[in-house]
Amino acid sequence: MYSVCDVVRDAVAQSHLCACPNDKLPQCKGVTKAPPECSVFHVAKLQDTKFKWKYTLDPLKAQKLSQINKDIEKDAITLKLLYGIELSPEDLEWWKMQRCLINKKTGAKGGQFANKYLERQDLELLGYSPTPIIGGDFMFTALPDKVLRTIPIAWDRFLNPAMMIFFLIILLCVILGIFYVLVRNTLRRKQKIKQHQMEIKRFIKEKEQDPYIHTSFESWPADPNKEWKELIPVYEAQGYCMADYRKKLGMPPGPNC
């Protein structure tokens, strides 16, 4: 009984003939038809195309998806006749097929479709190579295999340059949203402080307008600043710095400054 990985490895073995017949490629000499194993790559490429059309607003979306599904079904029939098993097209996607590949150098399972694992220049020429994870082949030469194998294969679908623009837009919106909230809260806090300061100044001004101030008929209590001194701790309890007012009234330093 064949497994999906058996089918994928068969396709990789025949990949150099997938562009045949083509006189420009020396390996195609005498080959009149591409091997049926190449249907695996056709399905994988169609699945990528289907994924892109699935989330578009193009008016031709339904028509295009219908045609893609028909093409996928044709290749699925070819593979069923070849291997005698029913292969789900969803299993033949680039990021899933990667699990089946073997690192020729170490024997470990390869995580991505990188040249050092597959030697797949022929696939690239045929247009079958999937978009590598950000960093491309450079990342596979810069990082050890143990590190690379810790990267979840499924993320290849989302961590590629073609899709990354959407995540960058979302990230930018989140950053702008946070910035907006912080600025709004800061402005509101400053506005409240300014409002309280105006109330304090108004309070002082009203007290100074007493016509009997500094006379025997003064309406203020014996300590003209008593009410003001009682008001300062109230504002300090709300987090305001009242150091200047304390200094003017001869009070000891307080908190929040």
Curated annotation (Swiss-Prot):
It is a multi-pass membrane protein. Induction: Expressed in the late phase of the viral replicative cycle. It is found in: Host membrane; Virion. Keywords: Host membrane, Late protein, Membrane, Transmembrane, Transmembrane helix, Virion. GO terms for cellular component: host cell membrane; membrane; virion component. The chain crosses the membrane at residues 123-143, 163-183. Belongs to the asfivirus C257R family. This is Transmembrane protein C257L. It comes from African swine fever virus (isolate Warthog/Namibia/Wart80/1980).
